[in-house]
Curated annotation (Swiss-Prot):
Family annotation (Pfam families): PC4
Alphabetized InterPro entries for the sequence: PC4_C, ssDNA-bd_transcriptional_reg, Sub1/Tcp4-like
Location relative to the cell: Nucleus
Family stated for the protein in its record: Belongs to the transcriptional coactivator PC4 family.
Any one GO cellular component localisation term in the record: transcription regulator complex
Record-given protein name: Putative RNA polymerase II transcriptional coactivator
Keyword terms: Activator, DNA-binding, Nucleus, Transcription, Transcription regulation
Biased composition range(s): Polar residues: 24-43
Biased composition (Acidic residues): 158-172
This protein's record includes keyword DNA-binding: yes
Recorded GO MF terms: DNA binding; transcription coactivator activity
Species, as recorded: Neurospora crassa (strain ATCC 24698 / 74-OR23-1A / CBS 708.71 / DSM 1257 / FGSC 987)
Region (Disordered): 1-43, 123-172
Amino acid sequence: MPPKRRQAEDTSDAEPQYTKKSKGNTGKAQPQELTKGSDQDGNTFWELGNNRRISSSVFRNTTLVNIREYYDAGGKLMPGKKGISLSLAQYQNLLKVIPQLNADLRAQGHAIEDPGFAQVAEQTDAPIETPKVKALESNKESIKKEKKKPRKSNIDVTSDEEEAAEDEDDDE
């Protein structure tokens, strides 16, 4: 067995002791009040904080809800790559999910307020019905109905079997 290493004696008190700095604020982030504004195109937006905005806009005759990160380009805030544009149907689905999401976050131990959603009953396990989900369910039902139909066997009779069947018919 190799000899055990001896620990170096800590005799030098002259060396500085370094401690690790904690990252960021140790306290919980407080929700900011949303400030309403308007961009150069006339679209209304609300500041979410940290150069993030939520706004509505029209693109090719379609109204979109944008949640996007912005960057400073020479004193002018420009939209960045990070973000999402939701159609109105997707936005409606998001609004339906928010009470359930809040309940899930509360279950994880986060303090979440429900401004504007206090009237809505929280449905923790209720499925969200979308047109696509309904279409998939109707497809599944039609496939099940097709499976219930009796099927004819797909067996080809070989020439040897045909001759044997003809011989039996001739014998009768």
